[in-house]
Amino acid sequence: MPRSQRRRVLVALPTAWDGKQLAACRAAWEERFEIVFGEPDDESCRADLDPAAWVEGYAAAAERGDGLDGVFSSSDYPGATLAAALATRLGLPGPDPATVLRCSHKYYSRLAQREAAPEATPGFWPVDARRPGELPEGLPFPCFVKPVKGAYSLLARKVDSPAELAAFLARPEVKEYVGGYLRLFDRLVAAYTGFELDGGFFLAEELLSGEQVTVEAWSRAGEVAVLGVVDSALHPLTKSFLRFDYPSRLPAEVQERMAGIVRRVIAGLGLVDSMFNVEMIWDPQSGRVSVIEVNPRMCGQFADLYRKVDGTSGYEVALALAVGETPRIERGGGRHALAASFPLRVFEGVRVARAPGADDVAAAEALYPDALVWNECSSGQELTDFLAFEDGRSARYGVLDLGGPGREELIARSRRVLDRLGYRFEPAAPPRPRDFR
């Protein structure tokens, strides 16, 4: 198709996964779409970014230039909200920014979940992190606490007593996170919502247990369609994510119940014309299905798992939705029976003595069809400040996405790929102070 006839789509605040995943499925979209990667990218976005200026800058460029036919973002924060604001400003398909923030702000999201699916919503209580000595009455212990606007699993953990919770909220890392990293979130909340609770709150929740999954789906024209259910394999002690498996091994009846809950929750939140993923947990002892959280954007890390098994990448779905089309997928249309994403982790502080170069990554990917390798560290880097990484008890330094005939073979392939990459680590010094600017 001539360039002038292709649909022009902006990827707002592109993430590390966007370029890699879009390149992997290029043959499926390059004749129909022209991709524009926005600035800044997700990693370099600062907390002092002006949301209104960003939206108006891209809107003005679109109106005086080649225009835009769609916009989306796989960036959880702030990309999903900014993409929604720009789509609204230009009259393009997409959710409105207030709805994205309602999904993203864990307290207001829980309120909507409790209204739509009370049986799947655990008890929850807002806690002001700026007043660690003033805890809400009736808060049960042990409980699970997390920021109302999280980043991966950063600063999310189980606490066993009021004293432990107060001490945790008083930590410098919490103050830096709330007062620094979430400054932009507070501006987004002020600009697009009437929320009374800003980013300075944490949410204390009833403990959940069971088998954890991610239900990824999309909402289009009032209908919700499930793209896939991905199982989470957790470290038995740290509860770090060790592997994500697609398709899920949960009983079909449980997956159907989850899909029904997701449809009610998304309708209650009012999210339309968007991909999203809902983290859920099933307790096989009680049969209870619970919502962990709603993320109003695609999961870039999982996109090629669907391509490996079903033949359609999550990015193909995102592009279709961005221009107002209904995505179409064919179950089992890929070349692999199973696919898995392997986060690579260290559980003790280390210095990266050797990280793979581009040639190492290419050689590792060449070992197996459709293999994708993402390296997240560099030689000489220290992986010691675990509070800056997801669960606070490990550090992720890369990701492997692989397809194969079965789980044991996938695990064996991951070991061979990791060996070929040639990472080397050595003990490291204690962590230095962090900067949340």
Label every model-predicted segment.
Residues 1-99, 128-133, 324, 346-348, ...:
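ATP-binding N-terminal substructure of ATP-dependent carboxylate-amine bond-forming enzymes
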Residues 48, 54-65, 84, 88, ...:
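N-terminal beta-alpha lobe that positions the nucleotide/phosphoryl donor
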Residues 120-122, 162-208, 240-241, 264-268:
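Conserved ATP-binding module of the ATP-grasp superfamily
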Residues 148-153, 336, 393-396:
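Short glycine-enriched loop/turn motifs at secondary-structure junctions
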Residues 157, 205-206, 396-404:
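Short, well-ordered beta-strand elements within core beta-sheets of diverse protein domains
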Residues 172-173, 198-202, 206-248, 257-289, ...:
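Phosphate-binding core of ATP-grasp and ATP-grasp-like enzymes
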Residues 257-277, 296-354:
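Active-site "cap" helix and flanking loop/linker of ATP-utilizing ligase/carboxylase catalytic domains
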Residues 346-381:
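Glycine-rich active-site loop/lid that clamps phosphate-bearing ligands
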